[in-house]
């Protein structure tokens, strides 16, 4: 037998997303030059994707959209914060929280998003974690370019039907930066885990977690720092950031279909502080405490054989909360004055989605039509889900074994960020944020 070479294209069209969907394997994550095994950097090489030309940033711009227009999912659960030292209200950051060694597959959509994914205008990343080893314990110690970590893969029941896979990582950048006499000393920690239990041949229950604790301190031990370092020490605040997502999912398979139910809690706490002359004995010039969190629940059913049609439909809902306390010492020509602001609110949200698809002409032509509706109780402009209808149509025709003609037309909506909804305009007399704030929308045409 001669040599056999098996290869697969990363671009695999599906009925839901016949265009602009790329599957990323763990091997590609490991081998992408300069990515340092960071999934956020790997996708920057995809067609239509640009990165922010700033060192050590993971902000991704897709098809001309903003860095806050990307959405991330892990085993069907939304991940609002994907990166360390994340920008609140955006999706960028310093390095990805996700450990690629725990992933089974990644689907990256730059268009033609499936209807079950909400709030994405530019891209959606759908990640699936692998289950743990059902036979024996396996541990791995990893020394990376910027961190050290421990991976664990083990059964946690005697019959091997319940497993655990997880990791913990901690950076050593603060030691390296101190040796290099840089003015800031960042430290990040993250954890990730999945507990998976096979209840029966048709039923599966899983629990996932993803979180981080990041802090940035000023390097005040430098003697006679250079002018550029003095400048950075003069304006840069110290900060702490905590984020986490905990979620659970239930999968039930039946003849011709599947049911998935998920519930999750996510949270982000962002604190910044600055003292006059970096001396804690002197008054503060900046003190920000900003927090946001969500409870989410979603149920979706997929039916694969309805007289030749395929149907996917689901509903979801939840609550979200935001709190911000800000103090700034503002210096003007007339002197200094204190600027204080406080904002907090709670919203409810709800969603519905459905898609119907079918193949024609002996599976040469695939057609899909879908609809999604979202709403939240923030204001009259956002509460009616019929204002945020997101229809979509896609088709794909197989011309030959190697050629396929595909197209997609869709409209997508995204709710404003909490930082935008929470801005109270205390410096603008008569300002009312709720009067004009609404969902963002985009019409997308891809062929």
PLM regions with names:
Residues 112, 129-131, 143-147, 156, ...:
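Transmembrane beta-strands of outer-membrane beta-barrel pores
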Residues 176-182, 212, 218-226, 263, ...:
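Outer-membrane beta-barrel translocator domains and adjoining extracellular loop/strand segments
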């Amino acid at each position: 037998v001669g040599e056999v070479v098996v290869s697969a294209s990363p671009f695999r069209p599906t009925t839901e997303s016949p265009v602009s969907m790329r599957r990323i394997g763990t091997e590609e994550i490991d081998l992408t030059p300069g990515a340092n095994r960071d999934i956020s950097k790997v996708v920057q090489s995809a067609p239509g994707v640009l990165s922010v030309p700033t060192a050590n940033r993971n902000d991704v711009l897709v098809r001309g959209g903003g860095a806050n227009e990307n959405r991330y999912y892990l085993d069907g659960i939304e991940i609002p914060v994907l990166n360390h030292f994340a920008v609140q209200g955006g999706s960028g950051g310093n390095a990805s929280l996700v450990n690629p060694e725990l992933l089974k597959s990644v689907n990256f959509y730059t268009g033609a998003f499936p209807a079950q994914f909400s709030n994405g205008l530019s891209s959606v990343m759908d990640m699936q974690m692998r289950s743990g080893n059902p036979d024996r314990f396996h541990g791995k110690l990893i020394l990376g370019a910027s961190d050290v970590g421990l991976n664990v893969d083990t059964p946690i029941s005697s019959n091997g039907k319940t497993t655990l896979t997880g990791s913990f990582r901690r950076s050593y950048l603060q030691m390296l930066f101190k040796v290099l006499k840089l003015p800031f000393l960042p430290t990040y920690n993250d954890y990730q885990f999945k507990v998976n239990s096979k209840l029966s041949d048709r039923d599966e229950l899983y629990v996932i977690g993803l979180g981080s604790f990041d802090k940035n301190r000023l390097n005040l031990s430098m003697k006679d720092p250079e002018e550029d370092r003095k400048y950075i020490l003069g304006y840069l605040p110290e900060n702490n950031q905590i984020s986490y997502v905990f979620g659970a999912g239930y999968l039930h398979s039946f003849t011709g279909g599947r049911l998935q139910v998920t519930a999750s809690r996510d949270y982000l706490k962002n604190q910044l502080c600055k003292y006059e002359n970096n001396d804690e004995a002197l008054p503060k010039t900046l003190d920000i405490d900003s927090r946001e969190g969500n409870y989410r629940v979603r149920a979706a059913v997929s039916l694969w054989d309805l007289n030749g049609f395929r149907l996917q439909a689901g509903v979801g809902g939840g609550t979200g909360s935001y709190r911000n306390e800000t103090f700034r010492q503002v210096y003007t020509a007339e002197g200094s004055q204190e600027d204080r602001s406080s904002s907090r609110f709670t919203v409810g949200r709800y969603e519905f989605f459905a898609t119907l698809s079918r193949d024609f002409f002996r599976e040469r032509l695939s057609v899909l039509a879908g609809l999604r509706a979202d709403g939240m109780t923030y204001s009259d402009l956002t509460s009616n889900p019929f204002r945020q209808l997101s229809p979509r149509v896609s088709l794909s025709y197989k011309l030959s074994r190697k050629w396929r003609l595909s197209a997609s037309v869709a409209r997508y909506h995204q709710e404003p960020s909490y930082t935008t909804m929470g801005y109270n305009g205390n410096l603008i007399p008569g300002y009312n944020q709720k009067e004009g704030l609404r969902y963002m929308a985009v019409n997308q045409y891809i062929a």
